[in-house]
């Protein structure tokens, strides 16, 4: 392991020492609690939607969550190890055959539904 990878691993360990990141995949419905600063106040905002893409790149890992808000599709990219992401909760496991679900952007209504994965055996959540 080279020096940069070692430093990234140490930074990931530091950022995740008091929170756990569950194992989730594209197709899963997640609730992401995001820290939002409004003036002097800081509060948590829940963002619930379907994970349409996940990018595993160490410290630069991110994932895209898509939801329908007021009939309009909204996508938001979250950095997995960002201090602004307070927690990630998997609400429902989706059964999909693709790693990137960008085709959901063109679909709406019943054609955009994702089948639920039954009897899912989750790998252990990452605890650094």
UniProtKB/Swiss-Prot annotation:
Q: According to the UniProt entry, where is the signal peptide?
A: none
GO CC, any one term:
cytosolic large ribosomal subunit
Give the top-rank taxon of the lineage listed in the UniProt record for this protein. Answer: Bacteria
Disulfide bond entries: none
State one molecular function term (GO).
structural constituent of ribosome
Record's keyword terms, sorted: Ribonucleoprotein, Ribosomal protein
Q: Which GO terms describe its biological process?
A: translation
Q: Which InterPro entries match?
A: Ribosomal_bL19 (IPR001857), Ribosomal_bL19_CS (IPR018257), Ribosomal_bL19_sf (IPR038657), Translation_prot_SH3-like_sf (IPR008991)
The record ties this protein, via PROSITE patterns, to:
RIBOSOMAL_L19
Pfam family example for this protein?
Ribosomal_L19
**PANTHER family attached to this UniProt entry:** LARGE RIBOSOMAL SUBUNIT PROTEIN BL19M (PTHR15680:SF9), RIBOSOMAL PROTEIN L19 (PTHR15680)
What is its biological role? This protein is located at the 30S-50S ribosomal subunit interface and may play a role in the structure and function of the aminoacyl-tRNA binding site.
By sequence similarity, the record places it as follows: Belongs to the bacterial ribosomal protein bL19 family.
Q: What is this protein called in UniProt?
A: Large ribosomal subunit protein bL19
Tell me which species this is from.
Aromatoleum aromaticum (strain DSM 19018 / LMG 30748 / EbN1)
